[in-house]
């Protein structure tokens, strides 16, 4: 992004699409803060890690406490900050409807702390992940 912004008109970029979910949090170390400081939105693709998160026992336990699905919890987590857009895949109308409900969910700090304990935030700079 820094190289892009150094190009003529490079600072016209409005969004950076990155792999971002509970299992892939490396962008939190430096890219997400950089995007924020440069007023560039972040678009999180694969917020469910291609469905892998839906089978995660830790996520399931936290979702059960909150009364929402694993998918809704994962999507709501990516949307906890106003400057992140989440683009989950939806294979059916039911999935679309459930995903839409995730936009209305505000996760309490206690749940966010549990998610941080279950899915550790980065402790150092990481290479950018892609699928």
Regions found by a protein language model. Give the residues of each.
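Beta/alpha (TIM)-barrel catalytic core signal, keyed to glycine-rich beta->alpha loops juxtaposed to Asp/Glu
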Residues: 1-122, 127-131
